[in-house]
Design a protein with these regions (language model features):
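Accessory cap/linker subdomain of secreted extracellular hydrolases
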Residues: 25-33, 39-40, 224-320, 341
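Catalytic active-site module of serine/aspartate enzymes centered on a nucleophile-bearing elbow/loop
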Residues: 364-367, 376-412
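Secretory targeting and sorting signals
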Residues: 1-21
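Alpha/beta-hydrolase active-site loop
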Residues: 131-135, 158-180
Length: 412
């Protein structure tokens, strides 16, 4: 890390008014920080910067000399309403033309203490965040401008597709505005696991929502393509069963579900426990939790509940648009179903469907690797993929060899 840090420099602060001082360790969490609140009007275009402040990039072990900006900007929620969120914008010292990487951390949060903007400024950390901070440092060392959005939004709506994609695309717009860059500036997007949600959805909705952005390549790994398939896979899984109540919290926030109408007493108790946690806390805390234990009669599964199924169907990847940029899609394959949490056949199915629509897809399957083990392999291949895309090199589509995978049809 020390070698990387020596290669990095300071971000330029542009003309957007600075709201307050650099938020270092000891700063309030975003939920209690006035910087994140906006009580003004939102009759402005998505991606408009509403306020900014300087920040210092801090790793889990030390501060760095890298400075950047946090920007509060307008974006759009799942229902199409105007909302705000924050992105972190970091600039390299390495000279050369500006190339933007929108990096989407897998913060998988129900509480704001895990927001990337808070983590990157030294507010909190975890092993997952630490690994991703090292990846971000690598992109900066390679000369990329890096934008890291809090894509779950103010309400921490985890896995919600369109909203996450909107936040990612508007974060790029906000960074371009802050740095006074033209919309023709080349942009790549990358994210793994939870970070694949804004990445894939951003690529899918960009042609309609942000057609002016110059997306040159998108890399997404470990994707939750259709959660109707993931729920039975993680039910009773000692490592991942805790994601089930967390998903219900996210759906309640995004869709206003009436939890008392279908959640069991035990389910309500667990939901209350995970309500403000992040994945490092809740994923493996409930090794005996099952899908069936979360619901009450007359239901035997969350997939029996029409409101839950409707929410899941609204977030099936590949269902609401077609990317117009080369895609790198990857997944581990540790057992006959998937990587222990993501479904290999679902990622195959998404890649195959995109190929059928004319998308240039490079698919990678990491046989024998779990979800966690596949992360560093994916990140290395993503860097190579994006480096080639920014350089204008040839693509390496393997559409002709991608299996059809699973059908991605709505459950309802």
């Amino acid at each position: 890390m020390a070698t990387v840090v020596l290669l990095l420099g300071s971000a330029s602060l542009m003309s957007v008014p600075v709201a307050q001082a650099d938020p270092g360790p000891g700063s309030p969490v975003p939920a209690d920080d006035p910087f994140y609140d906006w009580d003004g009007g939102l009759d402005v275009s998505p991606g408009t910067v509403l306020r900014s402040r300087p920040m210092t990039f801090r790793t889990p072990t030390q501060p760095t000399p890298i400075t950047g900006s946090q920007v509060l900007y307008k974006t759009t929620d799942q229902q199409g309403d105007g909302v705000v969120t924050v992105a972190t914008v970091l600039r390299p010292l390495v000279p050369g033309p500006t190339r933007i990487v929108s990096y989407h951390m897998a913060y998988d949060a129900l509480g704001s203490q895990c927001n990337p903007s808070y983590t990157l400024s030294g507010g909190s950390t975890s092993p997952i965040a630490g690994a991703e901070q090292a990846v971000i440092a690598g992109y900066l060392a390679a000369g990329y401008t890096v934008v890291v959005p809090d894509y779950e939004g103010e309400e921490l709506e985890w896995t919600i597709g369109r909203q996450s994609g909107y936040a990612a695309l508007d974060g790029i717009r906000a960074a371009q505005s802050l740095l006074q860059l033209p919309s023709s500036t080349p942009v790549g997007m990358v994210g793994y696991s939870g970070g694949s949600v804004p990445t894939q959805w951003g690529a899918e909705i960009a042609p309609e929502y942000a057609p002016e952005l110059n997306l040159v390549g998108v890399a997404a790994g470990g994707l939750p393509v259709d959660l109707a398939h993931n729920l039975p896979y993680v039910s009773g899984n000692k490592q991942w069963a805790g994601v089930i109540p967390a998903l219900i919290v996210a759906y309640e926030r995004a869709y206003g579900l009436d939890l008392n109408s279908f959640v069991s007493d035990y389910g309500l108790e667990v939901i209350d426990q995970v309500d403000q946690e992040c994945i490092a806390q809740f994923a493996d805390d409930y090794p005996t939790l099952t899908d069936a234990s979360m619901v009450k009669a007359p239901y035997n599964s969350l997939l029996d509940v029409p409101e839950v199924v409707a929410a899941i169907d609204d977030n099936i990847m590949g269902s609401q648009g077609t990317p117009r940029t080369p895609m790198f899609l990857a997944v581990g394959h540790a057992d006959p179903t998937g990587d222990t949490i993501m479904i290999t056949g679902d990622v195959q199915g998404l890649a195959y469907a995109y190929c059928g629509r004319g998308v240039d897809v490079q698919y990678a399957q990491y046989d024998g690797l779990t979800h966690s083990e596949a992360f560093p392999v994916f990140e290395a291949q993503s860097l190579q993929f994006l480096t080639e895309r920014f350089a204008g090199g040839p693509t390496h589509s393997n559409c002709v060899t991608i299996p059809p995978g699973n059908a991605l049809t709505p459950t309802s």
